[in-house]
């Protein structure tokens, strides 16, 4: 199989299938898909500078859900992401996955309220 054909097949994967592929590749080859963090040898930042620069975009992470409200959470994931039923169910059951990435603080807070109202536990991570 050529690399072009392989790339074409990977492009057809769903979000859940792609995440599973990455996990399996990390395990098999002992690598991490996380981008390496560059360490700068610059002097310390002025005190309070980090607090003043609040993150502007966030990832909405589904950490868990009330099992009695699983269907409600899946419906909300489908509404927010546009995923099909099977993909939304897989994302919800996997846990710890991003439902939406790179959203503004106001939208992230709104999504968090919606998900918590549906019985889900949400974490907002700066992106």
Swiss-Prot record:
Gene Ontology MF term list: mRNA binding; structural constituent of ribosome
Cited function: Forms part of the ribosomal stalk which helps the ribosome interact with GTP-bound translation factors. Is thus essential for accurate translation.
Annotated keywords: Ribonucleoprotein, Ribosomal protein
Pfam family for this entry, one: Ribosomal_L12
GO biological process: translation
Disulfide bonds: none
GO cellular component, one term: cytosolic large ribosomal subunit
Family: Belongs to the bacterial ribosomal protein bL12 family.
The organism of origin for this protein: Leptospira interrogans serogroup Icterohaemorrhagiae serovar Lai (strain 56601)
Domain of life: Bacteria
Quaternary state and interactors: Homodimer. Part of the ribosomal stalk of the 50S ribosomal subunit. Forms a multimeric L10(L12)X complex, where L10 forms an elongated spine to which 2 to 4 L12 dimers bind in a sequential fashion. Binds GTP-bound translation factors.
This protein's record includes keyword Ribonucleoprotein: yes
Name under which the protein is recorded: Large ribosomal subunit protein bL12
Annotated InterPro entries: Ribosomal_bL12, Ribosomal_bL12_C, Ribosomal_bL12_C/ClpS-like, Ribosomal_bL12_oligo, Ribosomal_bL12_oligo_N_sf
């Amino acid at each position: 199989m050529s690399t072009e054909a392989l790339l074409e097949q990977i492009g057809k994967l769903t979000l859940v299938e792609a995440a599973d592929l990455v996990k399996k590749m990390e395990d098999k080859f002992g690598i991490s898909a996380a981008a390496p963090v560059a360490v700068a040898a610059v002097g310390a930042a002025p005190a309070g500078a980090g607090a003043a620069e609040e993150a502007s975009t966030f990832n909405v992470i589904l950490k868990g859900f009330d099992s009695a409200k699983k269907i409600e959470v899946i419906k909300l994931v489908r509404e927010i992401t546009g995923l099909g039923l099977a993909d939304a169910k897989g994302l919800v059951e996997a846990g710890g996955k991003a439902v939406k990435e790179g959203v503004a603080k106001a939208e992230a807070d709104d999504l968090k309220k919606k998900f918590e109202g549906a019985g889900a536990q949400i974490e907002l991570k700066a992106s």
